[in-house]
């Protein structure tokens, strides 16, 4: 705040006290409203998330971000970061490329496919997050991972994963890839995850359609421990119907279902 007049600094402090927003957001909102405190706070409360994101974007040093992209870009194709660049990117963050943290970053970048970021995905993604250095991104990661506790955001993350994981041009997701990603994103969230994966590997052995992928999350959220609340007449994919038929004797200790 050292470049501000004392009267402006006072307004920044008042804005922060009133809204609980950070200094960067406060300065952005006040400058957008010509330092009229009442109008700035009204604007913030009408759309706090949007204004916070806008202030984050404006704080990014574009030249610094371009230099950072240059560290990772593919030497054969300057419009993307390839496998080697992704590995360096993960190393700089001290992350395993197969970790859920890297998948969260890919989600935030809206990456189209595994093992690469396009130039646009990287630059737009980092800008949206307000990051122009790996230090900033690393510091932000815990907050990004916390977003997965929000039901709507996790659903978006989960559905993004299907598109990200499948081969471009294919409608379905290869079974082995689906199982690997389910282990990553549904561990601790879907009580029948191990049983589901065993069932697929033993009895399905085919690719997974998008509809089945998406509805498995709904199934996992609603199904009872003994599966007694499953409605065979509901609009579930056949694969989930078959799984319930396979799994019920297992989860009920071998007893036959009355349904």
From Swiss-Prot:
Gene Ontology cellular component list: cytoplasm; nucleus; ubiquitin ligase complex
GO molecular function annotations of the record: cullin family protein binding; ubiquitin conjugating enzyme binding; ubiquitin-like protein binding
Record GO biological process: positive regulation of protein neddylation; protein neddylation; regulation of protein neddylation
Predominant localisation class: cytoplasm
Alphabetized UniProt keyword annotations: Cytoplasm, Nucleus, Phosphoprotein, Ubl conjugation pathway
Tissue: Mostly expressed in liver, kidney and brain.
Keyword Mitochondrion: no
Domain UBA-like: 8-45
Chain positions found as Phosphoserine: 55
Organism domain of life: Eukaryota
CDD domains documented for this protein: UBA_DCNL2
Outcome of substituting residue 211 to A: Loss of interaction with CUL1, CUL2, CUL3, CULA4, CULA5 CAND1 and RBX1. Does not affect both nucleus and cytoplasm localization
Domain writeup: The DCUN1 domain, also known as PONY domain, mediates the interaction with different cullins. The DCUN1 domain mediates the interaction with the N-terminally acetylated NEDD8-conjugating E2s enzyme leading to the NEDD8 transfer from N-terminally acetylated NEDD8-conjugating E2s enzyme to different cullin C-terminal domain-RBX complexes; the neddylation efficiency correlates with the DCUN1D5-cullin and DCUN1D5-E2 interaction affinities.
Name of this chain's protein: DCN1-like protein 2
Species assigned in the record: Homo sapiens (Human)
